[in-house]
Amino acid sequence: MNLEKLSKPELLTLFSILEGELEARDLVIEALKAQHRDTFIEERYGKYNISDPLMALQRDFETLKEKNDGEKQPVCTNPLSILKVVMKQCKNMQERMLSQLAAAESRHRKVILDLEEERQRHAQDTAEGDDVTYMLEKERERLTQQLEFEKSQVKKFEKEQKKLSSQLEEERSRHKQLSSMLVLECKKATNKAAEEGQKAGELSLKLEKEKSRVSKLEEELAAERKRGLQTEAQVEKQLSEFDIEREQLRAKLNREENRTKTLKEEMESLKKIVKDLEASHQHSSPNEQLKKPVTVSKGTATEPLMLMSVFCQTESFPAERTHGSNIAKMTNTGLPGPATPAYSYAKTNGHCDPEIQTTRELTAGNNVENQVPPREKSVALAQEKPVENGGCPVGIETPVPMPSPLPSSGSSLSPSSTASSSLTSSPCSSPVLTKRLLGSSASSPGYQSSYQVGINQRFHAARHKFQSQADQDQQASGLQSPPSRDLSPTLIDNSAAKQLARNTVTQVLSRFTSQQGPIKPVSPNSSPFGTDYRNLANTANPRGDTSHSPTPGKVSSPLSPLSPGIKSPTIPRAERGNPPPIPPKKPGLTPSPSATTPLTKTHSQAASLTTAEDLASSCSSNTVVANGKDVELLLPTSS
């Protein structure tokens, strides 16, 4: 098949077939991702079991030990492999575009050759004009001779016409006699025709009676058929309503099951936390008050060492609130509290609660007034402080002793680099990469090579491009209702494919620049990739973030193509209360293929959405304060 000679309808048909194949490929990819969730988690987290809190503690211990003993094989996959895949895809696209460009150039050359031939032909026509006039003169002379010959022929024909006219008169007389005879025969035939007409009238009356009876029977048959179609349509409408209600109830049941599952897991984690808190309070001794403090740059004051242990992959927000209120009471009443709190934060990915962190700063401010450690020890301990799982990156600076304590309202973190914030907000960031990034930023902050400058220029160009596209998508989605899952057979919007490509390139660029790019201060309201999609997702969902339990409106699957915190643009009619539209009924006793296709699609979409909810139930969303803004992180919980 020659692609250059295809017509417009054939090209449209070919494009529609290719688009259908692409959509089918995307569906197959999503199904395979949903099936290989366990293998994906095994590749991502290596040998550790994420459902066991003891294994999580062992992982953290090995991470801390790895800093002193030497480098080990990282747990996460190498982001360079992802970058190589992206570069390979770009090369394939470049080759394809080059082939299309070559085809366009060949067509262009062909058109140019055709135009050149037309110009040469026109030049030949103008050159042959004189020859044409000469030929016309010759033709004129020939025609004049032929005209004279035709005149002589006309004279001959006139003579023959006179002879024929005389013969015609004789024939006319004979025809008159024959016509008189024919008139008599015609009168006889008219009489017979009148008799036959009377007979035909009688037969037509009988035919009209039979037709009227047949029309009545047809009307009765049509009425019966219409009643049958109406009853069939009502039955199909009821069946479709029952199917829709069944899917809605099934989705609601799945959501309730996921919610009860997460609540049970949180209850178990809360019980474990309460037991551990009681055990830690019993084993705590007064000697713990003499521990060495660690100074961390928060405003202009120092604070003691605050260790955060990742006890479980779920968090206990009410317990932390209660303990934070107890510490606040101890600070307000002036009672001497312990220098290092005995409780451990059960946080996922190193998430720091702002209210608890403010209370911790108040306690640290009161302790700084009583005991001021030596400068060398505070600096040494500040450099050895780990960043837990890439959460709450705090810039380490030289402590400045201040006589006044911290104000109760001032809870600000020192600004970190753009690379560290992007690494922290990345869903596949590891504590090893975070510590290496902080160490490199502290050791050589002013180093910047020409290669890194080129990378940063490309990074900012991609950033401005995605920012303009995100603004357009935001304006288009602002006119719609709040996003949630849809169970009706609706078409998938192409913005999901755009968002998938945008997030893939954004994650690759963020990882690449977080390892090699220089450190730059970032304003609190800015995002390293233009528009902050996580904040947009938070504004789209006005519910508070006080509850860290995964809910269907906030938790996204780790296998989702969208970035963390961004939900699908589809809107569920099940949550709005409006049922999806009933497929149009076509006349006929058998159901048409177009009426059965949406129902099949609805079942497949419901199954895929149920799988997505199961994946979403195994994740918990947290908020990490990085560069003065909230960043949502997702981690699978114990299942």
UniProtKB/Swiss-Prot annotation:
It is found in: Cell projection, Lamellipodium; Cytoplasm, Cytoskeleton, Stress fiber. Residues 407-430, 467-477, 587-600 have a biased composition (Low complexity). Residues 87-285 form a coiled coil. Keywords: Cell projection, Coiled coil, Cytoplasm, Cytoskeleton, Phosphoprotein. One of its GO terms (cellular component) is cytoplasm. Residues 387-430, 463-490, 511-609 are annotated as: Disordered. The modification Phosphothreonine is found at T570, T590. It comes from the Eukaryota. InterPro entries: Cortactin-Actin_Reg, Cortactin-binding_p2_N. One of its GO terms (molecular function) is protein phosphatase 2A binding. Pfam families: CortBP2. The modification Phosphoserine is found at S284, S285, S481, S488, S523, S527, S560, S563, S568, S592. Residues 511-529 have a biased composition (Polar residues). Regulates lamellipodial actin dynamics in a CTTN-dependent manner. Associates with core striatin-interacting phosphatase and kinase (STRIPAK) complex to form CTTNBP2NL-STRIPAK complexes. STRIPAK complexes have critical roles in protein (de)phosphorylation and are regulators of multiple signaling pathways including Hippo, MAPK, nuclear receptor and cytoskeleton remodeling. Different types of STRIPAK complexes are involved in a variety of biological processes such as cell growth, differentiation, apoptosis, metabolism and immune regulation. Interacts with CTTN/cortactin; this interaction may redistribute CTTN to stress fibers. May form homomers. Associates with the core of STRIPAK complexes composed of PP2A catalytic and scaffolding subunits, the striatins (PP2A regulatory subunits), the striatin-associated proteins MOB4, STRIP1 and STRIP2, PDCD10 and members of the STE20 kinases, such as STK24 and STK26. This is CTTNBP2 N-terminal-like protein.
